[in-house]
Amino acid sequence: MAEKTEKPTAKKLRDAAKKGQTFKARDIVALIVIATGALAAPALVDLTRIAAEFVRIASTGAQSNPGAYAFAWAKLFLRIAAPFVLLCAAAGALPSLVQSRFTLAVESIRFDLTALDPVKGMKRLFSWRSAKDAVKALLYVGVFALTVRVFADLYHADVFGLFRARPALLGHMWIVLTVRLVLLFLLCALPVLILDAAVEYFLYHRELKMDKHEVKQEYKESEGNHEIKSKRREIHQELLSEEIKANVEQSDFIVANPTHIAIGVYVNPDIVPIPFVSVRETNARALAVIRHAEACGVPVVRNVALARSIYRNSPRRYSFVSHDDIDGVMRVLIWLGEVEAANRGGPPPETRAPTSAEPQARDGVAPLGDACADNAFPDDAPPGAAAPNAGSPDSPAPDGGAPARTGDQNA
């Protein structure tokens, strides 16, 4: 049998709590109940009033109406005892619920014949908990003896003064001295109570310890087989990413923000001259889109304002670019066409764009040539010279090669 060395898991503790196996410091609960009763007794118990009620009921006699006489006694008892009993019950129930974390042990209510097993009874008789209870009982005997000695030294004058006290004060003095004795006993027993709670907590976790095989089995039952779930997750991610990869590869360019948003734009003037949102991803997926686009040679334009505007105005993938963003998108397309033409060493291709998308100065916005001044070509530029920010700044792409199409464009 494997040695149980692993700490109990949260599920193990929850299952044990449903069976009634929870950490219970019963002596601390008893201390709270006794302290509550001792402190509440002087306020709730008035012996003078109780004696007067007894005299009144006894003087009426039971000959005339025995039923009413018995009912009067029962009513007096409930009126005296009910508040005190309810207060002590609440003081004991609340700590017990806190210790069990407000878990109701439903399974422990069922009748269990295994509890009558004599073998288990012998094991409990010679268990560590039985030894702990035996030592605790001896310590309580010593605590009680110490309490009596200290009480006698402190209040012996008050005890002997009871013989000379007036009858009206006798009951009150008895209650005060009893409360003092109880509180003194609880104070002396406090170290034993703390030690008992610590040992009980250790034994509780010791009984619920698990071996490594149990931990693995519990993980498989709660989370499922790790290898199967990982494989399913990988297959799902591959199926999910293939569609996005295809959309990225078919896009004319990717506009980024630069790391939190990635928008793919696709234009086919032969069908519809309006740009189309083919990819719309954020955060980690946006970074993956940018990396895949760079690997496939799809231009990546880092334009914060344009990326945010398209993301805000085009809330869904596979939708047309908003009218407010068409001008900016077409400026990027014209710029990319000029960059590709410059890398090939030929004239820029004719861009089939709507009239409203032609680069022009409007509302204080410079035309494309001014907005992308770093990418403009001087008149004396030699043929085949690469535009700045287009591809590698060290070596332009050779004729006929794939143009380097990643750059920064701030429209």
UniProtKB/Swiss-Prot annotation:
Keyword Phosphoprotein applies: no
Bilayer disposition of the protein: Multi-pass membrane protein
Biological process, per Gene Ontology: protein secretion
Transmembrane segments: 28-48, 80-100, 137-157, 175-195
Chain residue ranges for the region called Disordered: 341-411
Keywords: Cell membrane, Membrane, Transmembrane, Transmembrane helix, Virulence
GO cellular component term, pick one: plasma membrane
Compartment(s) of residence: Cell membrane
Described function: Part of the bsa type III secretion system, is involved in the intracellular replication of invading bacteria inside the host cell. Probably necessary for the lysis of the vacuole membrane and escape into the host cell cytoplasm.
Record protein name field: Secretion apparatus protein BsaZ
Organism, as annotated: Burkholderia mallei (strain ATCC 23344)
Lineage start: Bacteria, Pseudomonadati, Pseudomonadota, Betaproteobacteria, Burkholderiales
Name of the gene this protein is made from: bsaZ
